[in-house]
Amino acid sequence: MAYVATGYGTGRSVSAVKQNIDNYLRYYGRNQLSGFFLDEMGATSQHLAFYKQIYSYIKGLDEELRVIGNPGTLPVADYAGVADVLVTFEGKASDYTRFNPQDGNAWVYAKPNAAQAMLVHNATSCAAMQTAMRAAATARNNTGLVYATDLLYDFATNTGNPWANLPSYWTSLLGTVSALNRGTALPGC
């Protein structure tokens, strides 16, 4: 999966994003890439045309390339057509446990959970990570692609980088996801 920043639909041009995509394919080759992670994705109708162009471009290169879009929040429903997977939540673990897409977002439930993703940071313990994973597995959240880390980020001060390293409980995270997928007891922390 190749990372491409999109500047929320205003910070980069479509041609610059396409150039990034082309460079990844030229450097790594199609056989090394499963798709593209479009970060800093807009979430409003105002930027939808920008993402339609990018999605069409990627699928025109190869229909099998997977597109993961990261608005980090619930975008307007039409965004479901410009990514194969949408990150509908990016934030603190404590906020994710209260996350409820049901209000005004019926489109979320028309998609399989494999089309929804969450990125949780500040899950400072294995138990906090497991709470977030259990929340993702509920019908309410309908989220199939999950990641949690104990690394910290403070939005108010823009300090920390929760994506700099794998979490200290990486093995427990993998075991937790596996157990939830199988419907078995979660591993101990």
Located regions from the model:
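Glycan-processing catalytic domains of CAZymes
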Residues: 1-189
